[in-house]
C-alpha cells in the first residue's frame, strides 16, 4: 500500500491535484458517448419503458432496474456484464444512468452560443468582425465572402441576397466564393494560422499609436495566445456533434394522477432532435435551399435554447408561458448547481426545534429533547443494542426503538455520553454561529441553550429556532470537541474581547449585588470570616449593601499570601470569592458597582492570566450569582420611575428664544435659509441633551424619603447605567424629550418633539415621529439583504487567504500611530498594535534598552513597556507587506484573536476577516429601528478645546489680525499640536481656514481651555489686505443673481452656473482689491489680490466698498445636516471595498508646489500646480461648480486636497503608495463601525485590502511575452520576471492596481471559485478557451469538488499527502 493512499480519503475517489477545463472536440464528445440518440421519444406511455434510441434509451444509457435488462431475459447479479442480445441492454447497476452520456450527430454545424454571445464574443474577436456581422452569417441573413478570387470584393465582406446576385452577374458565377451559415464560420476559423497571426498582431501592436486600437489588439492577441497555449482548436467553438446528458440528471417522474413531470432539458433536447431529423430528411430529399436554410436556422436556435435559453432572441417557453430552464440556468445563481448543491448541501442526522433558556446548564452543555436524541442517534443505539445482546438483529433493534422500550433510554444515555452535538442558529454570520455542546437529555420538545452563548449566536428566546447536527466519525467528534466546543470559544475572533459575557438580567443582578449604600444598618463593622458575615446578614445586623471592612487574603507578586483589609460590602465579597487567585487579578477590579464593561474586563483578565478552564468556571458561577440576585432584588419599574426634570420648561423656553433670534437674523438677511436650518437643528440638539442630562442627574439621585423599605436607587437608571437594558437614548425619550426626528431621506425635521412618552405625544408630534419610525422599519427590511451580499462578496474575495508558513522573513512593515481627531484620541496606539509583531527592533528612546526584537509578538506586558517609554509610533508587520508565495505567514498576521496566542498554520484568516467585517453590518442594520427614528446627531464641532495641560505648537501658521484685533487663520493646512513637557505630541487638531485663533505658538494652556473657534456651517473667503472691492465678471442673471428670500424679502447676491449662456462660458466671477490709486493690490506671495468665487457663494460685500484685513467678502454655505447612522455607513463600506469612485470625489495634488489658476476651458476650471524647482507643472481640469479649497498662490503638498470630498482610492494609490492607501481605507471603514460602537481589529480589514491589491498592470513588457496593459497576478508577474532574468532578458515593468472585491473575486486564480461567485457563464467560457488549470488551493474550490478544505486539520492532511507523494516517488 503506498504512503499516499494511507492519507487518502476512505472512498475510492480518484486522486487528483488539479482540474483543467477545455473546449470539447467532436472526437471527445463521441468518445464520452454510449450511443447516438436518434428519436425524440422519451418513454412509452403504456408500458412506461424507455423507447429505443430515444432520450431515455436503456441500450445507450444503461438498465432502468439494477442487474435487469429491459425485456427481462437476464436478471440478478449472476448475469452481470452480459449484454442482452434481444434488447441490447447491458446488465449492470442502474446507477450508470447517472453517468453515461449519449450524443446527437448534427446535420449541420451549429455555433456554441457561449462563445458567440458571452461578451466579449470570442468568435467575432478571433475573426476580427463585429458580433452583429457573425450573427447575420450564422442566422442566414447575409453571405460572407470567403475567397474574393478575381473580383474586387474584400475577404470577410458581407453581402445580402440581392448584392450577391448582382456580384455574380457582374463577375460571373465562379469568380469568387461566398457562403452562409455556421459551416462558413467554421471554415474561416479553421483557416486561421495562429503562429503567423500572433506575429502579425504583435508587429501591428508595436507600430500603432492609437490607444483604442492598442486595446483591441491586446484583447485579440491575448485570445490568440490563450488558444495556442491551451491547444484548443478554434473550429471546436462550432459544434458538429452535441453531447446528451445522462437521463437520471434530467429525470422524468410520474405524478399521482398518471401525469408526468419532466425536466425542461428533455423538452429542449426533443426540439433539437426533431429539427435535426427534419433537416436530415430535407437534405436527403434535396429540398429547395431556402427551406433547408430556414431549418438550419431553427436548429441553431434550438441548440441555443438548450445551452442558454433567452440569451439570444425570445426565450423558448413551455405551455404555461414560462421560459425553459437551460443548461446555463442549471449552473447560475443561488438556485444553480454551484451554490445550491455544491456549496450548500442538506445535512443528514440533523433536527431543529425552538430554543428555551437553560440557566442550570454548564457552559459546555445544551439540553436535547429525548425524542430528538432518539431519532438522531438511531444508528448508534442499534449497534449498542446489538452489541449488548438486547436485540438479536438490527431489525429487532429498530422495533425496540420504535416501541420506546425502557432499555432503549438507558442505551441512549450511554450513547450520548461525551458525544458532542453541533448547534447552529441561522443566519450564521460568523463562525460562532455554530458551536459544539455536550447534550443532556431533557423532557419536552424544546432545545435548552446556555444563556452566556446567546451573544455569540445572537439568539433570544422569543421563538428562535436552532438546528442540531451530529458529528458521526471519531475525527469529526474530535474536531467538534477541540475547536468548536463552546468553552473553547470565549473570545470573539473579530476583536479578541470576551464574547461569553453576562448580559441583561445577570448584569442587573451583579450590579445590584455590588452596590454600596450609605447609612445602611451595621455600617463600618469589621469581619475576618465569610461565615461570620453570613451569620450577621441572616440576623439582619448588616445588608448586602452595607459598607464594611474585611480582612482578605491576597496573593502578592511573589505568589505569597498576604492579608489585606479592604473597604467593601458583603455583595462584592460574594463576587470576590469567585475570582481565581492570581496576583494580577486584584480585588479592586470588582470592588465597585459592576457594570457590563467592568464584568467584561474582569473576564478578559481572568482569561489572560488564569487560562480557559478558570474563565469558564468563573463565568458560569457569575451567571448563577447574577440570576439569583436579579430575582431576589425584585427590581421593576413603574411610571413614577420616569422622572421629568423641572428644568425642562426652562431649557425649552431658552431654546425657543434663541430660535426666534435666528428667525430674526434670517428675516434681516444676515444668514441664508440653510444656515438658519443648521443653527435651529443645533440649538434643539443642545436643548435635548441638556434636558436629558438634567433628567439623568435627577434619576441618579437617591430618593429622599424616610421610608426604609423604599428602594435606594432608581430602577430605570440602574438598568441603563449597568448596561443591562436600554440606553440613555431611550431613557431620554421616556422622561426627557424625544427631540428631533428624521425624515425618511435622512434629513432632520427642524421641529422637535418636545413631549416624552410619559407625558404623551400630541397628534402632530405623533405624526412627525411616525416618519422616523417607518424609516427604521424600512431600513431593516432593505439593508439586511445588502449587508448579507457584502459579506458574501468579502468571503469570496478572501476565501483563499490561509496561514501557510511561520515566517516569510520580510523586512517590510507598516508604521502605525494613534488616530487623533478634534483633539481626542479615537484609537490609541496600544489598541492598534496589541497582538501584532514588531517589524524592527524597538528600543527605549531614553535608556536605549531593547523592548522588542524583530518579529516578536506584542502582548499586554510589552504594551505596558511601550506605553511607559512614551513611544508614539511603531513599525509593525502586516499582511499587506507579507511576502509568502502562497497564503500569508503567521508572523505578519500576529495573534489569533480567538485564542490570544500566535496564529497557527492552516488558519483560514480570510474567511474570519470577511465574517468579522460582515457580521456587525447585518447587526447594525437591524439595530436602527430600536431607537425609533430619533435623530442621532450631535451638535456640529465649532471649536477646539485643550484635552490636556500642555504647550501649544502651530504648524503652517499663517494668520492675519482683523479689525476686531482677532487672529484669523489664513492657512488651508493649519494644525495645532499640544505637547507635554518632553515635547511628545499629546493631541493635534486641524484648524479650518477662517477660524479665530484664541492662543498662539508657545502658549501654555490648561485643560478645557478654548483654543480656536469657527462657524461650522459656512466656508468663508477672507481678505488678507485692506482695500476697495471691485466686482469682475459678475453679470446679473448670467453669473450672479439677486436671490430674494421668499420668507424675508431680503435680496442677497449668489454666484450661479453661467455655462448655459453663450457669453457666460468665458466668465470667471471674482473680487479684486484695489488700493487708493485704483490699482490692483499685490499679496505677500507676489500674486494679485483676486478671489475667485465658486457657484453657490453668497457675497458679503457690495461693489466699491472699503474693507479691512481679515474681513469676510463671501461665504460658501455647507450642505445641511443629515443624520449619521450605519445606513450612511454600510454603502460607504461597500463603496470602499468595491473601490468605486465616490459621487463628488476630491481631487488630490500629485506633487508639491504653488497653485495657479490657468485659463478656463468650457465648463471646467484649470488648476495648475507649479513645483518649486521650476520643473513642468501639472494641470487639473475641474468642473466650475465644485468648491476649490485652495487659493491662487497657496503652497500644497503631495496628497493635499484641491477639491473637497472623498478622494478616489486609485488616486491615493498612485500618489501616496500602498501603505497610505491601506491606512486610509482602514481608517474610513473603522470610522463607520466606530460610530456604532463596534470594534473590529484592523488586521481583518488589511486582509481584504491585500486581496484587492493582487493584480498588476504591465507598463513595459521588457523581454517577456507579457503585453502592455495586461492585468496579471502579482505572484505570476514575479515568477515571469525571475524566468526572464535567468534567461538574460530584460524584466517587465508593472504598476500595482486596486480592484474592487467583486472584480477581484471574478479574477481569482481559481476558475471554479470565480464561477461559483457570479457571472458563471462568462467565467467558464473564458476558462475553457484558455484551458485554465485550477490548482485547488482555496477553500471554495475544494468544497465544490468534495474534498477536505486545505485549512485547519485539512491543511496538515494536505501537507502530509504531499510529503507522502514525494516519498512514493523516491521509493518508486
UniProtKB/Swiss-Prot annotation:
Class of the enzyme per the UniProt entry, highest EC level: transferase
Cofactor binding note of this UniProt entry: Binds 1 Mg(2+) ion per subunit.
Reactions catalysed according to its record: RNA(n) + a ribonucleoside 5'-triphosphate = RNA(n+1) + diphosphate
Cofactor(s) for this UniProt protein: Mg(2+); Zn(2+)
EC number in record: 2.7.7.6
SMART domains assigned: RPOLA_N
Binding site for Mg(2+): 460, 462, 464
Any one GO biological process: DNA-templated transcription
NCBIfam families given in the database record: rpoC_TIGR
Assembly, per entry: The RNAP catalytic core consists of 2 alpha, 1 beta, 1 beta' and 1 omega subunit. When a sigma factor is associated with the core the holoenzyme is formed, which can initiate transcription.
Name assigned to this protein: DNA-directed RNA polymerase subunit beta'
The organism of origin for this protein: Rickettsia bellii (strain OSU 85-389)
Taxon lineage: Bacteria, Pseudomonadati, Pseudomonadota, Alphaproteobacteria, Rickettsiales
Gene: rpoC
